[in-house]
Design a protein with these regions (language model features):
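Conserved glycine-rich Rossmann-like NAD(P)H-binding loop of the short-chain dehydrogenase/reductase
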Residues: 29-45
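Rossmann-fold cofactor-recognition segment
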Residues: 49-67
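C-terminal helical subdomain
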Residues: 180, 195-232
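Residue(s) in the substrate-gating loop at a strand-loop-helix junction
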Residues: 140
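Conserved glycine-rich cofactor-binding loop
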Residues: 13-15
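Conserved mid-core segment of classical short-chain dehydrogenase/reductases
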Residues: 84, 90-106, 149
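Active-site helix of classical SDR
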Residues: 120, 156
Length: 247
């Protein structure tokens, strides 16, 4: 049996990213790279994983600095070989602000779409020659059909979903696997102060679904699974009704 790949968490403070890393360590991964801004301040996150027996490396990473992505990721792959990359960075943004502050709208789309495209493209280019590695990408139910109530964030996720779906097809047969995760509302730091939407999940529940999908070799997973039917219903909702849909 092949030894599990080292784990790279891009967004090393992400609640979901850390939960996924914990499950991969329990499944046999021995090395975890936590990449985030202020990487010197990841003691708590490191302790969670070392307690499970992992060797943890922290690395400075700014998702918005797309010019640095290639060199950073090439360095990780040079040190560790093929990795299981959990692309867990992102922002929710402020929809009301984004409607009037163009710079804020652009910042949300840059982090949630442009930076993701950059990371995913570089990872694909680095892992293809190795014919190994897995990449976990987080889309959202918000991108299944963009709503008036959160169209800036939703449109970024819609773009990411389309890009990741196409990239997964491009990687077919290469030895590199991409898992596209489509969660609903996740109760965590990013959504503090917000009322949970129906079919909400916790970071741990999302990570359980990710770990199971990876183990099964699946290419996509909805969390919870009932969201797939909801997305189908959303697609045929008349636009005048959809326009009034809440977050």
């Amino acid at each position: 049996m092949a030894h599990p790949n080292p784990v790279l968490v891009l967004g090393g403070r992400s609640e979901i990213g850390l939960e996924v890393a914990e499950r991969l360590v329990r499944a046999g991964a021995r090395t975890v790279v936590l990449a985030a801004r202020r990487s010197h301040d990841l003691a708590g996150e490191t302790a969670r994983l070392t307690a499970l027996g992992a060797d943890v490396e922290t690395a400075e990473f700014d998702a918005d600095d797309v010019g640095a992505h290639e060199g950073f990721l090439a360095g990780v792959v040079a040190r560790h070989g093929a990795v299981d990359a959990v692309v867990a960075f992102g922002v929710l943004g402020d929809q009301a602000r984004a409607e009037h502050d163009v710079a804020h709208a652009l910042a949300v789309v840059h982090t949630d779409f442009v930076a993701q495209v950059s990371v995913l493209s570089h990872l694909a280019n680095l892992l293809r020659p190795l014919r190994a590695g897995r990449v976990v990408v987080f889309s959202s139910i918000a991108g299944a059909r963009v709503r008036r109530a959160n169209y800036v964030y939703g449109s970024a996720k819609a773009g990411l979903d389309g890009f990741a779906s196409g990239l997964a097809d491009a990687l077919h047969g290469s030895g590199v696997r991409l898992l596209l995760v489509r969660p609903g509302f996740v109760v965590g730091r990013m959504t503090t102060g917000m009322s949970p939407a129906p079919l909400a999940s916790t970071p741990a529940q999302v990570a359980d679904a990710v770990a199971a999908a990876l183990a099964a070799g699946r290419g996509e997973v909805w969390v919870p699974g009932t969201l797939r039917a909801l997305a189908a219903a959303m697609a045929v909702t008349p636009r005048p009704v959809w326009r009034r849909a809440p977050r």
